[in-house]
Amino acid sequence: MAGKFRCILLLIAGLFVSSLSYAENTEIPSYEEGISLFDVEATLQPDGVLDIKENIHFQARNQQIKHGFYRDLPRLWMQPDGDAALLNYHIVGVTRDGIPEPWHLDWHIGLMSIVVGDKQRFLPQGDYHYQIHYQVKNAFLREGDSDLLIWNVTGNHWPFEIYKTRFSLQFSNIAGNPFSEIDLFTGEEGDTYRNGRILEDGRIESRDPFYREDFTVLYRWPHALLSNASAPQTTNIFSHLLLPSTSSLLIWFPCLFLVCGWLYLWKRRPQFTPVDVIETDVIPPDYTPGMLRLDAKLVYDDKGFCADIVNLIVKGKIHLEDQSDKNQQILIRVNEGATRNNAVLLPAEQLLLEALFRKGDKVVLTGRRNRVLRRAFLRMQKFYLPRKKSSFYRSDTFLQWGGLAILAVILYGNLSPVGWAGMSLVGDMFIMICWIIPFLFCSLELLFARDDDKPCVNRVIITLFLPLICSGVAFYSLYINVGDVFFYWYMPAGYFTAVCLTGYLTGMGYIFLPKFTQTGQQRYAHGEAIVNYLARKEAATHSGRRRKGETRKLDYALLGWAISANLGREWALRIAPSLSSAIRAPEIARNGVLFSLQTHLSCGANTSLLGRSYSGGGAGGGAGGGGGGGW
């Protein structure tokens, strides 16, 4: 008996101590900064609008609360069926101790922040009663014959403790407690703890203080109580991304513009006869390495520029000095009387000489940004531009149209929703420029790849569907990772499809436009014939069977054309043994000198061309929620 009596006394003492500790824990210490009471009064209007008054009692100690605070509210909430309800807010006003307080809105991906206070005014230490009055549309859920409200009262992202929370819900035209079900959930997101109690009048209040935990309530009532309210509007993420609505059809106009532009260019396409590549062993005297680069490789770049300069070195119009101790090379113009080669230069060669040595007879190559090479490179590009325009029909204009169309879609999609944050603009531009367009063009190249082992139908399937499949996988992975803060929820319906389709049409339209004019076809066939001739010359230096009349020695005079045909490395490795031992090999024929020259010229033309380069909160368990903090 004595043992039982002692156990009863210990139990009574424990209950007494726990009650005292509970009473102490619900009181915020005087030195601590936090929220002593978070009291929310919610009223459902007959039209379904949820009117909310948040009475937040702060104890400010100038630790985090220096000017005021901010209240984060989610812009949507994910329903149990996977659809999303977009929340529309209307801020009625904010008061501090009954006096209107300045506030403004900040928008973030997934959140709307009400920033309360003035950054020009310092808030003294003290206890303050703030009231935020706002209204929310599309906040409840309809399930069969009943309506349901799941509301995260406080949110779970406050940086300090909330010592007491109260929530009450009532109808504006109905008195009493008409609810068929009331429940609450506390803890972290997804937890079902019960740190609170439900009172007889339908109110809910917390028991213990909580930190970074949500306080979610659930109310259910018969549908007849809100029979005049419009049905809640929900959207499915896939239909929202893929299909435009009546109000968002404008976002698909750039796609229509691209289709019309492509049909216009296709209708004006040149009708030409294909030209076969024939064998040749002669390079025309009026032909330059830069022309070969443009005709056979379809571009005049730093290699074509290097090939033109090497051709002048071979002709003796420019002397190359390689100073290995200083890791630099010098181009020196040779006077007319100092060379035995008095051949008349072609207009392109004469222009290059004048561009290089406009201010002197020397150009020092150090591998850095070189303005002389930059200007010479641009002048040569301008010289070859008429030849390029007469050869190619596939104009870059269509790519410019596509870029403008993509930009129009992205800007319209980001500027149309309320509260543009800019994050989706940055994300869309990054995805489009760094992933979708490069991947699209790489897959399109498969369609025209010269690989007899792969059937054409397989390449067509890969070209048409691989970018779309990978875009879908990328979107799904993003959706799984970011969930309800996925910024595409807030874009107009069909925005994601419009972005991808615009980029897809740009790539597809450009690649299927005819590449050459009739003149371009002839020049391309001629350039390919010369490239094949140079490749045969290089292959003849290997041990093996040779054609009749071919020699194992490479012609030093063809070095410029070899560079233009991407054969410069092979020729440089074999050109020194090909020269007669009785003849002193020119400086450029030594192994390594040509590679260094190409590097210097490429840096001077290409690096300067590009300029400088550089390497380089959600709701917990329903609508409402977010969080807040001091500032």
UniProtKB/Swiss-Prot annotation:
- Native organism is Escherichia coli (strain K12)
Any one Pfam family here would be DUF2207_C
Q: Which GO terms describe its cellular component?
A: plasma membrane
Q: What is this protein called?
A: Uncharacterized protein YciQ
Q: Which domain of life is it from?
A: Bacteria
